[in-house]
């Protein structure tokens, strides 16, 4: 997988769709905010599970409305989210409304990169390109407890926002928003250096970054996600930003996952070139970008890196497959649930 990802990076260079090239290195199209139902018998690139009418909302203004109604919120989420852009877009929206907002960023409470590197060295296996050890660490280990617990809402501000990875660990008694991003988009962002490993100051090469994701970052972030799931009041799909940001209530998310776990469903596939790639998929699957030199990978059963789409009024909101396992793994696995659990 790492080798295939590296090959794809070499083939694709630093290009992509013109408007996306700066921050994602791929020629795969960004999943659409809205999509029409696929005709019967045609391969569906964006399979989605229906959650009912008017369940999914869109736009940075809608997110700002939700935050303004509550006054004090915690915004946690996954590694790979463009946190600076999210703060900037929300900040612009609140300034237009004349609101005084106090922002608290969790990254300032993280331990320094050298300390984290020493802590994680046993899990990462040095310079070996493939082998490491699944970490037993928890996300809390990345933070200085004194700094994390020092965040206090400003009583003079109209709105207080604690935002960033691990925000829920600070113990604020406030509604929790969780911002998710698909793992394929994380990797596309990684290839242009926009995504670094958790707590690191600078990016590694792509192969070592992915290895670090696999053995460390995604392990601890998934554990934290599982702990957050019952408390999430709003889930945000961040792969598109600005007016194409999508969100749904935590209650509708959990109900959708609950129903999905008792039904048939498909993950959203994604595609990449590779050393053994050919032209068959481009010729037989409508909607794929035909500018790629070949297609070798159809990531559809690789659920570690796949997402699940929910549909309402044509909107397609995506969350990672992990959410389904944390919510309903017994329904998904049946009699094998006690053996494999959420893994």
What kind of region is each of these model predictions?
Residues 3, 7-68, 85-89, 93-94, ...:
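NTP-dependent small-molecule kinase module
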Residues 15-61, 95-159:
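ATP-dependent small-molecule kinase phosphotransfer cores
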Residues 69-73:
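Pre-Walker A (Motif I) flank of P-loop NTPase domains
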Residues 74-90:
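Glycine-rich phosphate-binding P-loop
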Residues 75-80, 163-166, 239:
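Structural motif
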Residues 97, 149-199:
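ATP-dependent NMP and nucleoside kinases share a basic, alpha-helical "lid"
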Residues 182, 188-192, 199-221:
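Extended, regular secondary-structure scaffolds
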Residues 333-342:
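Short, intrinsically disordered, charge-balanced linker/junction segments flanking boundaries
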């Amino acid at each position: 997988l790492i080798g295939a990802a590296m090959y794809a990076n070499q083939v694709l260079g630093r290009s992509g769709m013109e408007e996306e090239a700066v921050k994602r290195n791929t020629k795969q199209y960004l999943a659409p905010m809205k999509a029409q139902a696929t005709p019967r018998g045609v391969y569906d690139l964006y399979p989605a599970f229906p959650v009912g009418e008017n369940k999914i909302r869109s736009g940075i203004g809608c997110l700002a409305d939700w935050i303004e109604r509550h006054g004090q919120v915690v915004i946690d989420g996954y590694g790979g989210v463009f946190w600076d852009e999210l703060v900037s877009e929300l900040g612009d929206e609140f300034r237009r409304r004349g609101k005084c907002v106090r922002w608290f960023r969790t990254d300032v409470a993280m331990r320094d990169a050298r300390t984290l590197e020493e802590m994680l060295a046993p899990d990462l296996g040095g310079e070996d390109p493939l082998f490491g050890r699944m970490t037993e660490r928890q996300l809390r280990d990345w933070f200085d407890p004194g700094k994390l617990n020092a965040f206090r809402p400003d009583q003079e501000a109209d709105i207080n926002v604690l935002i960033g990875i691990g925000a829920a660990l600070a113990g604020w008694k406030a509604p929790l928003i969780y911002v998710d991003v698909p793992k394929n988009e994380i990797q596309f962002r990684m290839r242009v250096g926009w995504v670094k490993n958790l707590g690191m100051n600078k990016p590694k090469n792509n192969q070592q970054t992915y290895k670090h994701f696999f053995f460390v970052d995604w392990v601890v972030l998934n554990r934290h996600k599982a702990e957050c799931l019952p408390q999430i009041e709003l889930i945000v799909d961040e792969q598109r930003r600005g007016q194409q940001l999508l969100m749904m209530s935590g209650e509708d998310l959990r109900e959708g996952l609950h129903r999905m776990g008792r039904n048939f469903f498909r993950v959203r596939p994604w595609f990449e070139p590779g050393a053994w790639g050919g032209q068959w998929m481009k010729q037989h699957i409508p909607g794929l970008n035909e500018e790629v030199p070949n297609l070798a990978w159809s990531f559809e059963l690789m659920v570690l890196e796949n997402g699940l789409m929910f549909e309402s009024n044509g909107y397609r909101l995506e969350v990672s497959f992990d959410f389904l396992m944390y919510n309903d793994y017994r329904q998904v696995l049946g009699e094998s649930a006690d053996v494999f659990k959420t893994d």
